[in-house]
Amino acid sequence: MVDTESPLCPLSPLEAGDLESPLSEEFLQEMGNIQEISQSIGEDSSGSFGFTEYQYLGSCPGSDGSVITDTLSPASSPSSVTYPVVPGSVDESPSGALNIECRICGDKASGYHYGVHACEGCKGFFRRTIRLKLVYDKCDRSCKIQKKNRNKCQYCRFHKCLSVGMSHNAIRFGRMPRSEKAKLKAEILTCEHDIEDSETADLKSLAKRIYEAYLKNFNMNKVKARVILSGKASNNPPFVIHDMETLCMAEKTLVAKLVANGIQNKEAEVRIFHCCQCTSVETVTELTEFAKAIPGFANLDLNDQVTLLKYGVYEAIFAMLSSVMNKDGMLVAYGNGFITREFLKSLRKPFCDIMEPKFDFAMKFNALELDDSDISLFVAAIICCGDRPGLLNVGHIEKMQEGIVHVLRLHLQSNHPDDIFLFPKLLQKMADLRQLVTEHAQLVQIIKKTESDAALHPLLQEIYRDMY
């Protein structure tokens, strides 16, 4: 009977080739960078919305040709006005006031002057123009009025004042009318909700696309594996391989094609090693198709695509391999077979050392109780890792990774609300996977040098060529 205590997903072990020492001492620092990225993403996502583009609906007649102003007008508001804030209200901010830009130049508004929010500079400019009845030289260029250039074209600046609704008849001595304040609150809430809804929709869309690509491209996933290991599958249970006799039986039925062409005449350890490589090559192909479906990946420079896959496939494979493992063994041959952990440990050295570290990692990884939607985002984050050596467009790839890590974090919060430390635990698992790949590659290096019959598959050799 197959024990089913742990979670499962697809794939089988992977063999490595030419490699010296995969991970550098800089790795922990690199993982720190990932954590900083995720923290900054979290801060951005939970921060308040800075309202910078609000405009009132209002008009005031301008003029054609030279501008002749209305007759006198009293002074406007005090230089600075702070609006009282009700705790919990929409305009509550660290400064205790609504943070609004000047309607004319975009500088920070000091208050509600002449019927609109304006800065001290534009308030004073409008007041002087009105009081002194200034006439400015006509300008037909419709100059854009900004903080840095607002003094260059007084004609266009005054027209901007009028167009946004400034009027000497609308003086409120810096206080915002109650109706305007209510209107502003409603506008801010609407904008915030619209932006939140839009961002949430984008994040959900990204998560959905990655999850669908995961289900589409991998032959085995955790749900399928759990059903098989629990004995709930409608078809026949997996054939258990626990000794040399059952191994030979499985080779004649489950993996007959893999042990053809002379492989069947080699010793059992070499045959198992060969089957592991064949499964790994198939998984590399699946991972390549999955990566192409990650939004933005296919648009990367081809060299960067190759580099990301070259450095990421083994980490991704060992993460997904956990899903077909439990404490007693692992599924093989598309779930049709189950090879026991004890049998793998009984193989002669160095082959007996290949799978045991993967079981140790899998038990800890499976304890996180991730589902396929979690794993799909985790694998995508592994592939789109901006610290891989030799990348050409590092900035763009880091931005991709930030987006995926952000989605992963939010998805975990939603999918596992009771485990607030799950996200940092997964970041640590990224570090553990790099170490696992390092140790695996070193072991395969030993096998390559000492076992003449255990040849490496050409694709796997290419993956490890000049990797570190």
Swiss-Prot record:
Q: Which stretches hold the DNA-binding feature?
A: 99-173
Q: Which Gene3D superfamilies match?
A: Erythroid Transcription Factor GATA-1, subunit A (3.30.50.10), Retinoid X Receptor (1.10.565.10)
Give the result of A431T, as annotated: No effect on heterodimerization with RXRA nor on DNA binding
Q: Where are the zinc fingers (NR C4-type)?
A: 102-122, 139-161
Q: Name one GO cellular component term.
A: chromatin
Posttranslational modification, per the record? Ubiquitinated by E3 ubiquitin-protein ligase HUWE1; leading to proteasomal degradation. Phosphorylated.
Record's InterPro entries? 1Cnucl_rcpt, NHR-like_dom_sf, Nucl_hrmn_rcpt_lig-bd, Nuclear_hormone_rcpt_NR1, Nuclear_hrmn_rcpt, PPAR-alpha, Znf_hrmn_rcpt, Znf_NHR/GATA
NR LBD domain: residues covered: 239-466
Q: Where is this site: Essential for heterodimerization with RXRA?
A: L433
Write out the annotated subcellular location. Nucleus
Q: What does the UniProt induction comment state?
A: Down-regulated by aging.
**Which intervals of the chain are annotated as region Required for heterodimerization with RXRA?**
304-433
- Keywords in alphabetical order: Activator, Biological rhythms, DNA-binding, Lipid-binding, Metal-binding, Nucleus, Receptor, Transcription, Transcription regulation, Ubl conjugation, Zinc, Zinc-finger
What molecular functions are annotated in GO for this chain? Answer: DNA binding; DNA-binding transcription activator activity; DNA-binding transcription activator activity, RNA polymerase II-specific; DNA-binding transcription factor activity; DNA-binding transcription factor activity, RNA polymerase II-specific; DNA-binding transcription repressor activity, RNA polymerase II-specific; lipid binding; MDM2/MDM4 family protein binding
Task: Cite the record's tissue specificity text.
Answer: Skeletal muscle, liver, heart and kidney. Expressed in monocytes.
User: Which residues take part in binding indeglitazar?
Assistant: S280, Y314, Y464
GO BP term (any one)? negative regulation of macrophage derived foam cell differentiation
Q: Which family does it belong to?
A: Belongs to the nuclear hormone receptor family. NR1 subfamily.
Q: How does it assemble?
A: Heterodimer; with RXRA. This heterodimerization is required for DNA binding and transactivation activity. Interacts with NCOA3 coactivator. Interacts with CITED2; the interaction stimulates its transcriptional activity. Also interacts with PPARBP in vitro. Interacts with AKAP13, LPIN1, PRDM16 and coactivator NCOA6. Interacts with ASXL1 and ASXL2. Interacts with PER2. Interacts with SIRT1; the interaction seems to be modulated by NAD(+) levels. Interacts with CRY1 and CRY2.
Q: What does this protein do?
A: Ligand-activated transcription factor. Key regulator of lipid metabolism. Activated by the endogenous ligand 1-palmitoyl-2-oleoyl-sn-glycerol-3-phosphocholine (16:0/18:1-GPC). Activated by oleylethanolamide, a naturally occurring lipid that regulates satiety. Receptor for peroxisome proliferators such as hypolipidemic drugs and fatty acids. Regulates the peroxisomal beta-oxidation pathway of fatty acids. Functions as a transcription activator for the ACOX1 and P450 genes. Transactivation activity requires heterodimerization with RXRA and is antagonized by NR2C2.
Its recorded name reads Peroxisome proliferator-activated receptor alpha
Q: Which organism is it from?
A: Homo sapiens
